[in-house]
A protein has these predicted regions:
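Short coil loop/turn residues that delineate tetratricopeptide repeat
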Residues: 59, 93-94, 135-137, 168-171, ...
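TPR alpha-solenoid repeat register
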Residues: 63, 97-98, 105, 140, ...
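Flexible helix-coil transition and linker loops at the boundaries of alpha-helical arrays
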Residues: 53-57, 88-102, 116, 130, ...
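Structural motif corresponding to the intra-repeat A-B loop/turn of tetratricopeptide repeats
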Residues: 74, 116-117, 151, 198, ...
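Residue at a conserved register position within TPR or TPR-like alpha-solenoid repeats
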Residues: 71, 113-114, 148, 188, ...
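Catalytic-site signature of metal-activated, phosphate-bearing donor transferases
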Residues: 1-75, 79
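Alpha-helical repeat scaffolds
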Residues: 81-89, 119-132, 156-163, 201-211, ...
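Structural register within alpha-helical repeat arrays
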Residues: 67, 108-109, 144, 184, ...
Length: 307
């Protein structure tokens, strides 16, 4: 784009025919790495071109965003933040809904603010501007929701993360939702945690099961699932034998790997009634070996349970 991006074209200016082959072809571009990136930093290729472009067009908010990228990549967060804010202040009142450049400007600014320890209310001001200009972009909600979950503001975390997933489902990820699209499992796990902490156990269970169907060895998802099954009261929300039946649908308990994984999660949670059912799937010799190899993982108590 302008001085810093290249694009194909015909020498005589004849328009090119463009075809969308993204379903047929998958191309991974690793960007500038190693020696190429070091050379790029040393000679300041992009930086000089962007500065020249801004000299010629001082109000170009897109170039300001690219300049912020250069400083962000170089680790100069103060300059990066300054140029991202300048870019946002110069943006028009209406943006193209697939304006990936402007979305990146907002996204990187929010990330810098989080790195700098800015208050969440300050970040919400930037979020409000971002969501107003690009209402279909899920990444803004994803970032704020993730930060809220990390700050243990689980109730608000639910709102933002649910909204992020809703936008992703409604509007897709073509030229948008780059972050949430590459952190979908973590988003489900964070949302499940927020739901669990706010008493929405049914939603937490459905989210965890969705994760485990595609990533069965997510300890975070399995732990949250079992925690929701056990509940907070004197009696478990789900009876141990019923919980075991669900685990048998998610895991191949004939596999030692799966049995050990489930046993480890149960032991970590501390649900001895369910642990008894799981230990029944091991031979006495296997249990003896597990106790000697991994002390403390399982108790040495009786394996029977009163029917």
């Amino acid at each position: 784009r302008r001085r810093i991006h290249e694009q194909l074209g015909r020498m005589d200016g004849t328009p090119m025919h463009i075809a969308d082959a993204t379903k047929e072809l998958s191309i991974l571009h690793s960007g500038y790495r190693g020696a190429a990136w070091e050379e790029k930093k040393v000679n300041g290729r992009n930086l000089n071109l962007i500065l020249k472009e801004l000299e010629d067009h001082p109000g170009d908010y897109e170039m300001m965003g690219y300049l912020g990228d250069e400083y962000y990549a170089a680790g100069d967060l103060d300059k990066a933040e300054s140029w991202y804010r300048e870019s946002i202040a110069s943006m028009p009142s209406v943006l193209d809904e697939r304006d990936q450049r402007s979305a990146a400007t907002f996204t990187y600014l929010l990330q810098i603010m989080e790195e700098n320890g800015n208050d969440i209310d300050e970040m919400k001001l930037i979020y409000g501007k971002a969501a107003g200009l690009l209402p279909k972009e899920a990444d803004f909600d994803y970032l704020i929701g993730t930060y809220l979950a990390a700050d243990r503001d689980y109730a608000e975390g639910v709102l933002y993360l649910e909204r992020a997933l809703d936008k992703l489902q409604r509007y897709g990820s073509n030229n948008r939702a780059m972050l949430i699209g590459s952190h979908l499992r973590e988003t489900y796990e964070n949302l499940a945690l927020c739901c669990r902490k706010t008493g929405k156990d049914e939603r937490a269970v459905s989210l965890c099961i969705a994760v485990l169907k595609s990533a069965p060895y997510s300890m975070e998802a399995l732990y949250l699932l079992l925690e929701a099954f056990r509940g907070n009261g004197f009696r478990p929300s789900v009876a141990p034998e019923k919980a075991m039946g669900i685990l048998e649908q998610l895991y191949c308990l004939d596999s030692m790997k799966d049995r050990l994984f489930v046993l480890k999660a149960c032991s970590k949670l501390g649900w001895p009634e369910l642990e008894v059912y799981i230990k029944r799937r091991f031979t006495a010799e296997e249990l003896s070996y597990i106790r000697s190899a991994w002390p403390g993982v399982i108790s040495a108590g009786p394996e029977e349970i009163n029917s």
